[in-house]
């Protein structure tokens, strides 16, 4: 018997019983003059209302093939605070600790979490998230801006399935205090928000807003986890920040690509190659190859 064969051994390790390490292996080539970076700018951990630890969220990003991930805990909503005793910067600090080994850029952020009409906004590239923990959300936005933050208006169609741009948003956009809109969040797409981005010259954003375990939430066989594709001068937090403020982004949502005409053209040019084979006379065959793993190309 198998037991008889193992009898007398101290330890028997059965490696085949372990969950295999599977990477989504999403390949998107660099566009001309810029590096193409795959990013998720909206995630949560147990330090707000998520269910996993910050370091595991980073490793999930690694397995997804991301170049960057932002840790954006709710400022006002922390249901685990009876046993998670920490300030608003702690989850980022923990995530940052595995950044090098996971080979992924960890971006500090936070989510200002208020009811509509203001709604939820992510502040990215923060130096101190604690400065946002105040009663007046508009002052919280100003405090984030003083730190050089990029402000993203999150899921405009949630929770009432109506994407309304209220007066407060118009004023913030006019004052250059909102820089991008999350027109894809998780499983939802807000088509009218595409018009907001276009009309107000804002950055197109799409993210998971993941709270649970990624591979228990999204179909990994079809690359359905949304992401923001960023065209940066360099693979660094500074490069990503500059690119977002310069509106160099495209949203990937399942098989859809969403963005400005210029950015989409640049991406298609990088992904597709053409070869013309003469046949006879004036006839020829054009072969088009997809150099990416994007299903929409």
Which stretches of residues belong to each language-model region?
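Charged catalytic cores and adjacent phosphate/nucleic-acid-binding surfaces used
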Residues: 3-39, 58, 116-126, 161-297
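Conserved catalytic scaffold of divalent metal-dependent phosphoesterases
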Residues: 156-158
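Compositionally biased regions
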Residues: 2-3, 145
């Amino acid at each position: 018997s198998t037991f008889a064969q193992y009898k007398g051994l101290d330890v028997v390790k059965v490696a085949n019983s372990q969950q295999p390490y599977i990477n989504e292996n999403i390949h998107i080539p660099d566009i001309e003059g810029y590096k193409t970076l795959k990013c998720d700018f909206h995630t949560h951990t147990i330090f707000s209302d998520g269910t996993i630890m910050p370091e595991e969220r980073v490793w999930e990003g690694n397995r997804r093939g991301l170049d960057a991930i932002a840790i954006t805990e709710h400022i006002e909503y922390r249901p685990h605070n009876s046993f998670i005793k920490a300030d608003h910067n702690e989850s980022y600090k923990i995530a940052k600790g595995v950044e090098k080994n996971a080979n992924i850029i960890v971006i500090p952020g936070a989510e200002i979490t208020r009811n509509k009409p203001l709604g939820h906004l992510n502040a990215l590239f923060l130096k101190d998230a604690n400065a946002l923990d105040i009663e007046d959300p508009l002052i919280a936005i100003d405090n984030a801006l003083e730190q050089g933050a990029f402000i993203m208006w999150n899921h405009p169609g949630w929770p009432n399935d109506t994407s309304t741009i209220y007066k407060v948003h118009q004023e913030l956009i006019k004052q250059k205090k909102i820089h991008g809109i999350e027109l894809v969040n998780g499983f939802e797409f807000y088509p009218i928000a595409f018009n907001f981005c276009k009309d107000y010259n804002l950055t197109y954003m799409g993210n998971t807003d993941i709270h649970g375990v990624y591979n228990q939430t999204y179909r990994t066989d079809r690359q359905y986890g949304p992401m923001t594709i960023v065209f940066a001068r360099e693979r660094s937090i500074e490069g990503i920040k500059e690119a977002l403020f310069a509106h160099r982004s495209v949203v990937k949502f399942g098989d859809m690509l969403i963005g400005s005409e210029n950015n989409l053209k640049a991406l298609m040019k990088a992904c597709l190659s053409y070869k013309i084979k003469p046949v006879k006379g004036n006839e020829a065959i054009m072969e088009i190859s997809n150099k990416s793993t994007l299903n929409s190309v």
